[in-house]
């Protein structure tokens, strides 16, 4: 039997540079990654450094609501 809510939840990470700059003129789109986080260990919003194929560099990807 499961004990209460699951600790691991899926989260979406979105490129903050693409959102701020309104996406590059050459390509349209916003980089998004799907990952998991442990709700008990990281109650705050998750931010990771990931590669953005639209910016062509590593940028900060922040957690967004579904």
Swiss-Prot record:
GO BP term, example: translation
InterPro entries documented for this protein: Ribosomal_bL33, Ribosomal_bL33_CS, Ribosomal_bL33_sf, Ribosomal_zn-bd
Gene Ontology, cellular component aspect: chloroplast; ribonucleoprotein complex; ribosome
Signal peptide, first to last residue: none
Keyword Amino-acid biosynthesis belongs to the record: no
Coiled-coil ranges (or none): none
Subcellular location: Plastid, Chloroplast
Similarity remark: Belongs to the bacterial ribosomal protein bL33 family.
PANTHER family noted in UniProt: 50S RIBOSOMAL PROTEIN L33, CHLOROPLASTIC, LARGE RIBOSOMAL SUBUNIT PROTEIN BL33C
Name this polypeptide is given: Large ribosomal subunit protein bL33c
Gene name of the record: rpl33
């Amino acid at each position: 039997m499961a004990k209460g809510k699951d600790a691991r939840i899926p989260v979406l990470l979105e490129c903050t540079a693409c959102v701020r700059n309104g996406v590059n003129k050459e390509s349209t789109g916003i980089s998004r990654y799907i990952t998991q986080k442990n709700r008990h260990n990281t109650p705050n919003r998750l931010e990771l450094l990931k590669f953005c194929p639209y910016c062509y560099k590593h940028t900060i990807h922040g957690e967004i609501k579904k």
